[in-house]
Amino acid sequence: MNDNPVNLKGLETIYSFSKKNKQSLPPVEKWNPPFCGDIDMKILRNGKWFYMGSEIKRPAMVKLFSSILRLDEDACYYLVTPVEKVRIQVEDAPFVAVSLNKVEISSKTGYLFKTNLNEEILLSKENPLTIKIGENSEPSPYILIRKNLHALLSRSVFYELVDLAEEKIVDDKTCLVIESMGECFNIHEVEKE
């Protein structure tokens, strides 16, 4: 870890960009600045952001940092500006899906998730659901937010989704499946007694 404090020099540029383009995100995938070290910033599994051991409580600041977050091929998370890149720690996923709504779009039923940062994501082919089974055999459900950044579904949202799912045969197995925007997403194989 780099003990020198890192100054995110490009942050003011990002802030002005995000104020002008509320729906757009900075093009962090196009930026290739030098790596400037690690900073003491961490995103907990519950979606709370901490800097130097203190929770960042200003939603606008968390949203700003999340807009410049990138997951690179080395499986590390970085905050990226045009002039520098710093590594942060993420316990699980950087976002948490905290609510779920059923929607009708172009005569198709879909499910709209809202994250802890008020981003809305439609469960679809572009934003699929994935389930990872942990060492404790507990499922961890995720929805793709953008590029390779995911939101962990909160326990209550996952239970709500399971309640909405239907049993279907998938590859000769009975599974709980949720259909959204014409796509089927396998939640879990149903164990028959």
Task: Please tell me what each predicted stretch does.
Residues 1-193:
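Long, non-globular segments of proteins
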